[in-house]
Curated annotation (Swiss-Prot):
PROSITE patterns: RNASE_3_1, RNASE_3_2. The lineage of its organism: Bacteria, Bacillati, Mycoplasmatota, Mycoplasmoidales, Mycoplasmoidaceae. SMART domains: RIBOc. One of its GO terms (biological process) is tRNA processing. Homodimer. It catalyses: Endonucleolytic cleavage to 5'-phosphomonoester. Residues 92-102, 206-223, 310-332, 351-360 have a biased composition (Low complexity). Residues 21-34, 69-89, 260-274, 298-309, 333-350 have a biased composition (Basic and acidic residues). It comes from Mycoplasmoides gallisepticum (strain R(low / passage 15 / clone 2)) (Mycoplasma gallisepticum). This is Ribonuclease 3.
Amino acid sequence: MENLEKNTKKKIKKPNNFKKNNKDKTEELKDKPTPRMFKMTPKSSKFLHQLGVTGRKHTEKPVPLNDPDYEKKIREIQAKEAKKIRSDEVVNNNSKKQNNNKQAKKKANKNKKQKGNNNNFQNNKKPENWKQKPAANNQVKAIPNSEKSTAKTAINLIIKRTFETLKQNNLIAPNLKQNPNKKDKPQQPNVAAKNNNQKEVKKPYNNFVNNQKNHNKNNAGNKGDNKQPTKPLNQSKLSKSTIVELPFTPNFTSNQPKPTQKEDSKKVKAKKAENSQPQESNKQVKKLEVKTNQQKQDQTKKKQPKENKNQQIKAVNLNNNQQKTNNNNQKNSVDKSENDNNKKKSEANQKQENLNPNNNNKKKEDSKNESNNIPLINKNISDQQIVKISNYIKDNYPVIYADLKEKNRLGFNSNLDDDKLIVYANYEAKDLELLLKKFKVVTNNIGLYEEALTHNSYANEMHLKYNYQRLEFLGDAIINKIVAEYLFNHSDSSEGEMTKDRIKIIQSNTLIKAATQLELINYIRVGEGLKIAPLSPKILEDIFEAFIGAMYLDQGEYAVRKILNDTIIGYYQKGQLTENTDYKSIFQEIIHSTGLNMKIHYERTYDRQKNLHTVSLYAGGIMYGEGKDSSTHKAEIKAAKEAISKFRGLLKLEK
């Protein structure tokens, strides 16, 4: 039965009251963009240009990620969106804050009014120092009617009281005319000083400090009373030397009652009307009092330095007399010691002169030469001249070396090597970031540049697995490629002329010149043994090629073309390159001049372990020369050099 009752109870579902969809509204919404129904919380600013801050349709154009001013533009877009759309929560919070501020201002105004009413004298609560005020008011009433206009002001009372306190504390100079006969005795100078060089100087300011301390002690017990302050214990009159111009104005009105800061507005207006007339008269009174005090002080000052000078002169004369006696005793002792030493030296020199008369003549000649060379030492060379000389040598030495080699080319001297230029490495290599700042390069991998500027000796000492040889191989190939493309695109010459121009651009002298221009030798890391010894110029070529290889891997071919256009190709365009000895073409001329139709052939091999290319030169099946180098081009030149040296005695070329 229970189951049947359960089944009979039908579940009554409440009908869902769906809203009627108006067709007109749906048609209008088709044209409008559908708003986003979820709140956007962008975690990074990189997607703000696509999504927006509020989740609604973005009205601004999107900003590309590669734009250099990406961050600035996004900030501007965010500011515009913040002005257009503000969430309801922010508006409600701002309205609450405004209401709270208004209520706080009302409370503050009420408190101010209550405080103003409490300060009135009508209330029962009396402020501090209330008993002291009627004394001042009674004094004003006692003054006759003729002086009421000036005496009512509080300024006159303050001036009089300060003047009286200054007199009591002996801070104003006494009247010298009253006691002209009395003169203070000058203090006797301390003759028996510990050190003769010390000079005693008086410190008059200390007297003022002692008087002021005593004044403060006496005033401490009389805070509540209106009586005049008692005089200090040391009431002896100050001497002329103790009168001091104070660097500040002391406040002696500490015991007097302070006027209340807030008075009734009616009283203030009444006082202003009364004080407007007597202010001018008060100013005149002040000026007269100040002038009289200044005149008295000036008279005392004129007399003061005369006495001080006389006292100082006596002390100085005594000290000077003692110093002279001490100095004379010292001189006599020094002269005796010098005479004894000179006698000993003269005896020793006479013995040596008798033994070695030839050496003495040489010493005299050397001393004459040194005396003649002294004025040259005083002629100092400026730093600017040194910089000019060093730059001229760095830039022009490779060219000078090439010119000297050309003059000896036709004679076919035995000195056919290029290793004549002497180079020294720095004891400590410079920072690579300074080098890269010249080229305005932001590196993605500094390790490549470190590898390009590490020599074998440094790698062996530090147990490194890399050096610049691998990057040199890559850089040599890149330079050949870029130079060949430049000549092919910018010249209409034949194949043979282009090869000569390419050799001219890639020759060792141009690479040395480029390396010196970039100052790569300052950044190379070398072992301790090579820091002292001179380096071969071949290192400059290798460094330049390795640096080009590192730049190609890090920045690409475009950055390499910039450097080569500024250095190697730029020299070619300006006509700064000199024709180098083309040993390969000379060898061909020698073979053709014999009249024998011999074929010239180069055989090339490569050793990967040693990173060396070996080239052997054959003519008519006979090997005439062999060369080894890290690049094939340089190995071919060395093989041609060796071949020319064998024909040197057979042919006589015209000079």
